[in-house]
Amino acid sequence: MMNLAAGFLLMLLEVLLLPGTPLSAEESPASTPGSPLSSTEYERFFALLTPTWKAETTCRLRATHGCRNPTLVQLDQYENHGLVPDGAVCSDLPYASWFESFCQFAQYRCSNHVYYAKRVRCSQPVSILSPNTLKEVESSAEVPPTSMTTPIVSHATATEHQAFQPWPERLNNNVEELLQSSLSLGGKDQQSSRRPGQEQRKQEQIQEHKLEEAQEQEEQEEEEEEEEAKQEEGQGTEAGLESVSRLQSDSEPKFQSQSLSSNPSFFTPRVREVESAPLMMKNIQELIRSAQEMDEMNELYDDSWRSQSTGSLQQLPHMETLMVLCYSIMENTCTMTPTAKAWSYMEEEILGFGDSVCDNLGRRHTAACPLCAFCSLKLEQCHSEASVLRQKCDASHKIPFISPLLSAQSISTGNQARIPDKGRFAGLEMYGGLSSEFWCNRLAMKGCEDDRVSNWLKAEFLSFQEGDFPTKICDTNYIQYPNYCSFKSQQCLLRNQNRKMSRMRCMLNERYNVLSLAKSEEVILRWSQEFSTLAIGQFG
């Protein structure tokens, strides 16, 4: 199948790389290396990826081989006039208008089945959102819009190839609302921080332009209206301040000075366009750290419970915050969210877990992409009914694992699975880039002790930890198995007979037919024999 897909891509490239019709005068500027295709060029490009099975074929190759596959690199180069841009790109998708890289944009198209989304020129200048020019932007933000329109437009073209700062205005709305309501927005501090700038601007305007008294009065009236609007904004955030003050009422002054309420400007909606990645990461870092310190000061949990739950999401009292963070990474593509980046930075750099990601179930989460391992752990923590705790990786974490929840988000990890539905789990559709059919066949040929088969069985077993007995194995026929190999052998056997069977929760109030070890060996042998019979019939 992969050879056929690769052959199709090569044919596609041959067609794409044929000399095309010359561009019109209007389209010629768009042919700059690294620039997006024009509408006419995209029509030609997408025509060769129609019907959708052709686009799906390229997506399967991208999911298996990644963006650096030489064939896919050629395809991406064509879509960018011969040069794949290094930095951020923009799209015509209204709900996902920018991406940190073209590779991420291409993966997003595949994972969300929007195969014919187009890359477009970015309308917003990149330099404004760069951390290196943060101070320049803050100072230029004080200039009236009419005076900064022209330089922005002219500068946008020169800097479009640079990377967007991925944090401003893009954090999940629910996270932003929570942070604004549960932490200090500092309405009063906003006013005090903005008034000096306004007064200075007013004086400069008077000195430079020598406006008449009538114009000065008009400006004063406008400023008064702005101040009134800001006061209303500050009053609207008092509820958030009061909610935090209730939580902090029992805390010592030292903790209060370290909490996020001392940094109100970080959460001001009106200055989101000049926030940088470090600030956003610091926000979430401080939020979770302050919650942990509050736990210790108020002794909300006894020492024994706390020692058992170190690294657990449930250790933090700000459950609303964690619920929103979980919602953010589960409802969106986790590895593409600013939430995951900030959260990962906090755990790796501040809490000291490091780059490797392991948990208390002996699993070492696979880093198939920059945030894949972290997202795999967090999705498990957010979704699983079992207690999943992060641990520093050591020799005891031997099981390579990637969450089926991450795989279900269709990121190119090489593994795919359906999200467990109503306490049922059909298994991994893909593992290591290979289908479940391949693994069923290898199980029949090599047995359960084969290293690759063993890793596959462990990954599947740990992908579903629910019910009253998360480590027991029950199926939808109400049979309980002594080991996962016998369960999988039975599932492979039934699937070969076009019969469906899934793993489901083992519950206290249900009765199951418990399979003995001897019977389980018979099940494994039966699948091996049936596969051998099929193989002889096909190839003998």
UniProtKB/Swiss-Prot annotation:
<dbReference type="InterPro" id="IPR009865">
    <property type="entry name" value="Proacrosin-bd"/>
</dbReference>
<dbReference type="GO" id="GO:0005576">
    <property type="term" value="C:extracellular region"/>
</dbReference>
<feature type="compositionally biased region" description="Basic and acidic residues">
    <location>
        <begin position="196"/>
        <end position="213"/>
    </location>
</feature>
<dbReference type="GO" id="GO:0002080">
    <property type="term" value="C:acrosomal membrane"/>
</dbReference>
<feature type="region of interest" description="Pro-ACR binding">
    <location>
        <begin position="316"/>
        <end position="424"/>
    </location>
</feature>
<keyword id="KW-0968">Cytoplasmic vesicle</keyword>
<dbReference type="GO" id="GO:0016504">
    <property type="term" value="F:peptidase activator activity"/>
</dbReference>
<dbReference type="GO" id="GO:0001675">
    <property type="term" value="P:acrosome assembly"/>
</dbReference>
<feature type="propeptide" description="Removed in mature form">
    <location>
        <begin position="26"/>
        <end position="272"/>
    </location>
</feature>
<dbReference type="GO" id="GO:0009566">
    <property type="term" value="P:fertilization"/>
</dbReference>
<feature type="signal peptide">
    <location>
        <begin position="1"/>
        <end position="25"/>
    </location>
</feature>
<dbReference type="GO" id="GO:0007286">
    <property type="term" value="P:spermatid development"/>
</dbReference>
<dbReference type="Pfam" id="PF07222">
    <property type="entry name" value="PBP_sp32"/>
</dbReference>
<dbReference type="GO" id="GO:0001669">
    <property type="term" value="C:acrosomal vesicle"/>
</dbReference>
<feature type="compositionally biased region" description="Polar residues">
    <location>
        <begin position="245"/>
        <end position="266"/>
    </location>
</feature>
<keyword id="KW-0732">Signal</keyword>
<feature type="region of interest" description="Disordered">
    <location>
        <begin position="183"/>
        <end position="267"/>
    </location>
</feature>
<keyword id="KW-0597">Phosphoprotein</keyword>
<feature type="region of interest" description="Pro-ACR binding">
    <location>
        <begin position="26"/>
        <end position="105"/>
    </location>
</feature>
<keyword id="KW-0964">Secreted</keyword>
<dbReference type="GO" id="GO:0031410">
    <property type="term" value="C:cytoplasmic vesicle"/>
</dbReference>
<feature type="compositionally biased region" description="Acidic residues">
    <location>
        <begin position="214"/>
        <end position="230"/>
    </location>
</feature>
<comment type="function">
    <text>Acrosomal protein that maintains proacrosin (pro-ACR) as an enzymatically inactive zymogen in the acrosome. Involved also in the acrosome formation.</text>
</comment>
<protein>
    <recommendedName>
        <fullName>Acrosin-binding protein</fullName>
    </recommendedName>
</protein>
